[in-house]
Amino acid sequence: MWKLNKSKVLIEDSPDEEIQAQQDAQIKDQLLQEEVQSPVSQLATKELQSLKTSFSSMKGQVTVQGASFRGWKEVTSIFNKDDEQQLLKGAKSKVISAKPKEDLKTEKKAGFWDSLAIKQNIQPKKADEIEGWEPPHITVEESPTFPDDGLDDPNSWPGWEDETKGSTKYTNLTSSGNSSRWSIKSAGKLVSIRRRSKGNLTENWKELE
């Protein structure tokens, strides 16, 4: 009896549980639809769509790049290795030709400043150290020898004292006799002065040497 009643009760209760489960599923579906209709969900769907489109475009680009790479291979197959080396040499030569200009500028600057420093440090050379320089040869001319006529000695002139005694303190130079004597006397004095001056010059030159 108990078993039969229990089975009846379970059979009677089962349709109600099924109805509740169906209702719960419907409620969940409605909630999901509302979430999909919300702006956040719309943004998410847009992002998913954009990702799909970008992925498809990337596939297209990969195919295009592959085609361009094949075209580049075809173009490079036209040229030989020698042509490639010549092209590379031309580019290298341009780079090398650009570098020496900068090097020349730096060298010029360094040379200019170095030359100034060298000029300041170099001491002026003496005349003896200069190559090819020789001291001037000074030849001492012999002084002319004059015969001693006794012009310097006033006592050798006859009648000189007699004429001066009768005159005043100073003799008269305007007279004809005295003028000739004075000219002879002065000539003798000049010769002696020249001899003395030449002797002084030779002594000075010897001291300098």
From Swiss-Prot:
Cellular component terms, GO, for this chain's entry? cytoplasm; cytosol; nucleus
Q: Which GO terms describe its biological process?
A: spermatogenesis
Q: Where is this region: Disordered?
A: 126-183
Domain of life of the organism encoding this protein: Eukaryota
Q: Name one Pfam family in it.
A: TDRP
Compositional bias (Polar residues) spans?
167-183
List keywords of the entry alphabetically. Cytoplasm, Nucleus
Question: Which subcellular locations apply to this protein?
Answer: Nucleus; Cytoplasm
Q: Which family does it belong to?
A: Belongs to the TDRP family.
What is the name listed in the Swiss-Prot or TrEMBL entry for this protein? Testis development-related protein
Gene it is expressed from:
tdrp
